[in-house]
Amino acid sequence: MSTPSDSSPRARLAAGIPSVHSSIYWRIGFSVGDQVVLIELPKGNGSEATLILRDIEMGRARQYARVDQVACPADFAPAGGLSGDRETANAQAAAECLRRAGVTHAYGDRTLPLIFVDYARQAGIVVDCEPDRWVNERRQKSPEEIAHLREAQRVTEGAIQLACRLIARASARADGVLMHDGAPLTSERVRAAVDHWLLDQGYVNPMSIIAGGPGASDCHFYGYGELRTGQPVIVDIFPRNRASKYNGDCTRTVVHGEIPAEVVRMHAAVRAAKVAAEKVIKVGATGEAVHRATIASMIASGYAFGLPKADAPTSYCAMTHGTGHGIGIDVHEPPLLDIKGPALLAGEALTVEPGLYRQDLGGVRIEDMVIVTQDGCENLNHLPDGLDWK
């Protein structure tokens, strides 16, 4: 990390594709499929934002982007001209823009491509790395962002309900395989039904977790093949609104038919751990404190924490992951509810998702989304969290 050599104000330098670079999209509110450059120049007590992008996108950017100036690389061509490579030309234009503005110091976050640092330094500009700058700015959600998350979670709950009812209301073949519309009900069929429903609601959906049986003892097992009666099925859905770009994230566990006694016990422990975690969440509490409350609750219920050792019996049952994470434009954002998790801030959106996993049985997980408040948290979920979805 560079050390400033003078006291002059520093400019922010960022570059990326807004459709996939969430921090740039969050800052400018404008999505495009090619790399853009965002430069924020010190001005008075604030800054002036310049967006550099392809000339064919300038009209839309002037209409929709939250910036003060829109330009293309040709507007900041250096004396030797621009490269024929688009990203190199962007880096050259960024350095020239900073040079013309008299900037001697700039900073970027953890996502700034090295080529931009190199061209800026060639122009005599010191570039500092501030890896957490945008991370910290994005943690506290505005009322508008919370409204987007609330709506995304509402729709996500609809998808969860669809999947859990489809499983719970299926018929069972003599060998225990679930049947629906004359064919075996598989994880793939449930996943497809969820995808189609969410598409109609205006959401894009990454590969949902529809994980039944022993395979679900891996907490991130997506689930494949036929679903069976009497086995817990973890349903974890995390879609993104196509318009707002904000995500929902919710998990429930469903069992078709008779629920095994051990699954009932695991579910009660998971539910109690979630309650224990949510009781700790408030402004100033740490993500680590929340996670330790989850672990303490699991241990009090008779379960372990940590991945199984190589010689562990298949009946070993434990929570194997953190308690939760931040959520927003990205489905996984800081902070973590885990060891070394930081102090929580007002307005942060978090998932709370304890789970238990057993190799010979599968897994049980419950996940809600909460908003951190001064004295506690607001749970955005309204869906029941039981095992019977008939």
Where would I find each of the regions flagged by the language model?
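Active-site neighborhoods and metal-handling regions in enzymes and metal-associated proteins
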Residues: 2-390
